[in-house]
């Protein structure tokens, strides 16, 4: 089971929601098979993002994160829901 729910999927983007009740252990380090630009839509409170070998940083509305193919990264749970937009281009 995935730790998120896709709210909207198009050819250009995915709107994805991470629920406030998710178990933090489900937010594992991972790599994606393609480059991604992620836009933070609704960051809740205290949600963070971390690349491998870097310190985590707070997620803020409208923040853009460029994630390269096969780059290790993770999301760190905060309070409330986290909603992101993953641009497929």
Regions found by a protein language model. Name each.
Residues 13, 35-37, 81:
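Intrinsic-disorder/low-complexity, polar/charged segments enriched in Ser/Thr/Lys/Arg/Asp/Glu/Gln
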Residues 60-64:
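Loop/turn positions that initiate beta-strands
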